């Protein structure tokens, strides 16, 4: 995979080309100090939170300073969130212009593994603090930053705010991932492959044809690479929306395919794919066991996972000692 292929898939590169067929979005350059804040692995202190004009009696029981037991320990550190006033104003103006609620992401990835930490268990954000909370809690975004010890200086990181669209329950069955090799679709996969949707099996021919037609009319030969992956959403009116573009390779989820078969299955002389109008369409059928969400493992802190799997022996030993001490104390009582 070439570096150009990855760069061509960043949001600001493809969005202007396909803006007509995508969700309305705003792109804001990410200042260096904001990037440093997101990369900081220290204690999570969320910045960008609007100051409350006062303590609400309805929501909280206000307590006077004399009633609070403050620590006199000189070693107690006070964690203060950094502020980014200019950036905060730009973000809030963008959020307001998009209707007050947005879906945030960076150049390539979104914090989809961190939805569980939000109060609404959603990626829906209405303030900068909502965005920071998701970004600081996401392993997916850190992976992008940490994948290369010497990041390309030409890469300008950007905050992408996409207008929030409420999807009806079960609307995930309308999302599909398309794999393109040599400017021809070789495979289409159900995006949410962990669930079975009866609608897909009933409409598979129509879905197959509409995606192929949309690709030929609007995407084919218009994307700078000939090998790539793109995600689409087909709404209830039949209109197709471009959601994202990704590199053709292991950095992108292959869903119901494997990258091995995607790479070797396409051959200009291959009988199965001899005609362009015959990409392989895979979806979860009723005979396949429904699989758990791939993001469930991100709901637990890594320490808990290490304990449960025994991957960190020192943590496990400390835990057993703590448990034994607790039992000894209970027996003494």
Question: For each of these PLM feature ranges, what is it?
Answer:
Residues 1-333:
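Preference for protein termini
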């Amino acid at each position: 995979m070439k570096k150009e292929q990855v760069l061509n898939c960043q949001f600001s590169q493809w969005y202007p080309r396909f803006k007509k067929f995508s969700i309305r979005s705003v792109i804001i350059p990410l200042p260096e100090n904001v990037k440093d804040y997101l990369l900081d692995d220290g204690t999570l202190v969320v910045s960008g939170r609007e100051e409350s004009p006062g303590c609400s009696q309805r929501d909280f029981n206000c307590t006077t300073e004399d009633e609070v037991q403050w620590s006199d320990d000189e070693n107690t550190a006070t964690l203060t969130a950094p502020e980014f006033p200019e950036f905060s104003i730009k973000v809030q103006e963008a959020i307001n212009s998009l209707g007050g609620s947005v879906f945030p992401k960076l150049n390539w990835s979104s914090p989809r593994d961190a939805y569980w930490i939000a109060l609404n268990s959603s990626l829906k954000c209405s303030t900068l603090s909502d965005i920071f909370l998701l970004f600081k809690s996401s392993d997916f975004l850190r992976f992008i930053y940490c994948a290369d010890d010497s990041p390309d200086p030409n890469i300008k990181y950007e905050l992408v705010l996409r207008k929030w669209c409420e999807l009806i329950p079960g609307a995930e069955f309308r999302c599909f991932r398309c794999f393109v090799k040599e400017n021809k679709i070789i495979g289409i996969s159900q995006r949410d492959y962990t669930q079975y949707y009866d609608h897909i099996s009933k409409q598979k021919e129509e879905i197959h044809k509409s995606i192929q037609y949309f690709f030929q009319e609007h995407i084919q030969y218009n994307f700078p690479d000939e090998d790539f992956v793109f995600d689409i959403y087909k709404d209830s009116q039949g209109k197709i929306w471009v959601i994202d573009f990704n590199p053709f390779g292991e950095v992108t989820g292959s869903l119901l395919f494997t990258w091995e078969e995607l790479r070797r299955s396409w051959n200009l002389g291959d009988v199965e794919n001899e005609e362009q109008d015959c990409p392989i369409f895979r979806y979860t059928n009723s005979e396949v066991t429904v699989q758990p969400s791939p993001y469930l493992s991100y709901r637990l802190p890594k320490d808990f996972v290490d304990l449960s799997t025994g991957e960190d022996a020192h943590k496990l030993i400390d835990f057993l000692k703590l448990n034994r001490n607790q039992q000894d104390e209970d027996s003494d009582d």
